[in-house]
């Protein structure tokens, strides 16, 4: 457990690079991946079911040792699943059309959830990949829980939230996406996991671009699993969420590439990998795992 936490702490720093993290990353690769390496063909999809401290680790960041050390994401598409039961029950991934439901840039009434500087930019970067007639966009005051719950959810193949998230470590059903308030009620701005599972969806991909704090976006692993589980139970084929703080600057770029790749026909798991690799192969600071590794996809087979 100590090596996982130490490695994660290294990755959480914006300056955490391959050079500064290779020792622990390679040790974890030898421990967790190498024993099964013969069973993993190059370029294959690898599904990870992790628990405990390992659920906080993005396996894509493990370092493949050798003459040219590199992150495992270079060799394989890494997918996560909350449980064997959910993995077995996963529906085949189909295209299912190009309709988008997008909610974000909510109005803040709580200082714990300040407004997000880059939310509007991220939303515009997503909108442009869909025909106007095929998208429903709820922003500012209209980005509220009722707008989601009252939508004809089953018609949307893509659902995307640009909002704060709050995790409940005691009850995953209390995890919530923070939107605009609909009334003076204390929690009218929260879209709870317990409500999400009561409203069936057929989305090919749900993306929870959850944010927390001024200029950073984060989501505790337990809460990510709670919300991912809720959307999967509701009928989503794949869910993308963030494991830790990410830069408010790099996320719009990553999402732009993700949706461009989806538009070009890549399946969600491949599209996310390609978006991450675009940052990893860039020349600036965005190549560090802090910027591309937080986002994880669940059940994208």
Spans of model-derived segments:
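Residue-level detector of buried hydrophobic side-chain packing
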Residues: 46-48, 103, 126, 159, ...
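An often Trp-containing, charged/polar helix-loop segment at the C-terminal end
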Residues: 250-301
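Loop/turn elements at helix/coil->beta-strand transitions in domains of secreted/extracellular proteins
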Residues: 42-45, 98, 132-133, 154-158, ...
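Catalytic cores of nucleophile-dependent amide-cleaving enzymes
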Residues: 84, 90, 157-257
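Active-site-proximal beta-strand/loop segments in catalytic clefts of secreted hydrolases
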Residues: 49-52, 103-107, 141, 161-165, ...
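Short helix/loop capping segments that flank catalytic or ligand/cofactor-binding pockets
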Residues: 56-59, 65, 88, 111-112, ...
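Peri-functional-center coupling elements
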Residues: 1-45, 64-141, 250-259
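Functional beta-strand-loop-alpha-helix junction segments that form "active/interaction loops"
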Residues: 18, 22-23, 110, 115-174, ...
């Amino acid at each position: 457990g100590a090596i996982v936490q130490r490695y994660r702490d290294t990755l959480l720093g914006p300056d955490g690079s391959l050079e500064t993290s290779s020792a622990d990353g390679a040790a974890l690769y030898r421990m967790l991946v190498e024993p099964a390496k013969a069973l993993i063909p190059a370029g294959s999809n690898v599904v990870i079911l992790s628990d405990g401290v390992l659920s906080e680790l993005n396996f894509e960041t493990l370092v493949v040792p050798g003459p040219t050390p590199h992150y495992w994401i270079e060799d394989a598409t890494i997918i996560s699943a909350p449980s064997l039961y959910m993995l077995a029950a996963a529906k085949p991934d189909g295209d299912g059309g190009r309709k988008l439901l997008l909610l974000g840039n909510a109005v803040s009434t709580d200082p714990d959830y300040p407004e997000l500087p880059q939310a509007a930019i991220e939303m515009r970067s997503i909108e442009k990949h869909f025909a106007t007639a095929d998208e429903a966009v709820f922003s500012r005051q209209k980005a509220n829980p009722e707008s989601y719950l009252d939508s004809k959810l089953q018609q949307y193949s893509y659902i995307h939230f640009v909002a704060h998230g709050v995790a409940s470590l005691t009850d995953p059903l209390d995890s919530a996406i923070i939107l605009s308030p609909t009334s003076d009620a204390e929690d009218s701005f929260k879209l709870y996991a317990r409500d999400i599972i009561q409203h069936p969806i057929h989305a090919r991909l749900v993306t929870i671009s959850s944010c927390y704090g001024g200029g950073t976006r984060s989501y505790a692993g337990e809460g990510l699993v709670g919300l991912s589980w809720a959307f999967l139970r509701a009928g989503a084929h794949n869910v993308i969420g963030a494991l830790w703080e990410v830069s408010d600057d790099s996320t719009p770029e990553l999402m732009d590439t993700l949706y461009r790749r989806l538009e070009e026909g890549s399946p969600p798991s491949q599209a996310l990998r390609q978006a991450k690799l675009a940052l990893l192969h860039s020349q600036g600071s965005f190549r560090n795992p802090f910027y591309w590794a937080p986002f994880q996809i669940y059940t994208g087979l």
